């Protein structure tokens, strides 16, 4: 039996170069489609798979209380160094279980993370995301499509499959988009998805 490859495999080897590329593109450019779904006022936000901290720092600058989850030690240290002045709570944790992450959040961001999980992990992770987001909050997810870089662990996951899985755990898609790669890789494309918890029902009647 082959040993299990961690979902974040490959990111520690070239962490400095990866961070340089991430930091070279602004949060507002990469996540333009997510901007309308950010909380309207101060709230709790978690960036799962925070990488170099670019997104977490941008969210903190908007006044949110931000938790950055990053399992790769090299990237986490780089993020803490680059954004030392930002009000970010960094934690060492990973999907699918996120055992160290406490509380609930108004906005849950997963940027270029979901395709690193295999099918059983995606089921467990979606269940956990549904637990983390508050009623009226949003889960924003970007999904990479394209060839797998050497040394990385990625799976072919469609937006349709992801939406169907989210629905199993009470998360409805309120936004679906598809776009090109911000780093100008011609063979890479992205799906953008935003989910919201479905309202509770009583005797089959929504309220």
Predicted regions and their residues:
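Short, conserved loop/helix-junction motifs that constitute active-site signature segments
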Residues: 131
């Amino acid at each position: 039996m082959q040993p299990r490859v961690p979902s974040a495999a490959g990111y520690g080897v070239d962490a400095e170069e990866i961070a340089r590329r991430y930091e070279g593109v602004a949060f507002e450019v990469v996540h333009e489609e997510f901007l309308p779904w950010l909380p309207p006022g101060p709230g709790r936000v978690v960036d799962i798979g925070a990488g170099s901290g670019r997104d977490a720092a941008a969210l903190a600058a908007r006044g949110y209380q931000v938790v950055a989850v990053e399992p790769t030690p090299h990237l986490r240290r780089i993020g803490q160094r680059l954004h030392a002045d930002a009000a970010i709570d960094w934690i060492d944790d990973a999907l699918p279980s996120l055992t160290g992450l406490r509380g609930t959040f108004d906005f849950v961001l997963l940027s270029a993370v979901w395709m690193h999980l295999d099918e059983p992990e995606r089921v467990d992770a979606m269940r956990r995301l549904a637990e983390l987001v508050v009623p009226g909050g949003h889960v924003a997810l970007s999904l990479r499509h394209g060839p797998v870089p050497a040394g990385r662990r990625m799976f072919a996951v469609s937006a349709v499959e992801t939406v169907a899985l989210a629905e199993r755990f009470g998360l409805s898609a309120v936004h679906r988009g598809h776009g090109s790669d911000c780093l100008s890789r011609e063979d890479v494309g992205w799906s953008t998805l935003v989910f919201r918890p479905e309202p509770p029902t009583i005797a089959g009647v929504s309220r």
